[in-house]
Amino acid sequence: LAYLSKARELQSKYATMPHGMTVLVGCETENIESPHSIDALTALLHGDAVQDTPVPPPFVGRGTVDYIVGSVHHVHGIPIDFDEPTFLKALQVHGTKDGYTSLLHAYLDAQYEMLERLRPEIIGHFDLYRLFDPSAPWYPECTTPHGREVLNKLKRNIHFASSYGALFETNSSAFRKGWKEETYPGRVILQLILRAHGRLALSDDSHGVHQVGLNYTRVRDYLLREGVNELWYLVPGGTLPCADKGGNLSEVHAASEEARQARELSDTPGRDAPT
């Protein structure tokens, strides 16, 4: 909560400067252990209100933060991006045979749960699971049963996020971590996003001032090679849409959910998604 207080203070400060700068205050998610991790985040963002009246997914965090970055960094409670030995431990949990595919299934299921429950505005480093072994056989041939199952889950998550207008983070940090020709999302995921008419946002995932904007030129070159010609960004939004009108959030959610579900089932779920 100290973070929110300081962030809001700086948000106001920069907005009123002569050459004002728009600052958005957000938070990044985790799904270490289902369902407790997301339960804890929802409770933190809404306090006792969650116990009395559950907040529909599109409105989680409204009034507390300006946006949510939906990320997954753990599989079955084990970090996959901390260091290589820990990643290998996560991989070994799934056995030596088809270990990569099994880990990927677990990751995508954890990601999907997070998407369903939180509807984050930004999807963080979609294919973070590739960090320490980007050339591994993550994606079996689509002509095999394993390959079709993986592809279906990838498309499931991408179509769901695209259908409500999420932005997929194009994250330059993989370059500073040793990747050469691509970053998050890698080519396979990026092309699935583009086919779904998903939206991309630019991010450096900086953990300090020395990383701000790092490798953006390389990201630009990568995106141009892959046929990307536009990027999206967030702007300040409102609080709960009917908080001052006596409305019911569940009714507001239900009114838009049918259209979202129809988009999700289409080949291009992001085409007419809300902005």
Where are the model-predicted features located?
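A metal-dependent hydrolase metal-coordination microenvironment
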Residues: 1-86, 93-105, 211
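A general structural detector for well-ordered alpha-helical segments in enzyme core domains, enriched
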Residues: 3-10, 40-44, 55-56, 110, ...
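Secondary-structure boundary motif
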Residues: 9-17, 116, 163, 195, ...
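A short helix-to-beta-strand connector/capping loop
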Residues: 18-23, 64, 119, 198, ...
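Residue-level marker for buried hydrophobic side chains located in beta-strands
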Residues: 25, 122, 200-202
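Active-site metal-binding loops of divalent metal-dependent hydrolases
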Residues: 29, 72-73, 126, 204-206
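Divalent metal-binding pocket/active-site signature
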Residues: 63, 67-178
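Charged catalytic cores and adjacent phosphate/nucleic-acid-binding surfaces used
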Residues: 130-131, 138-275
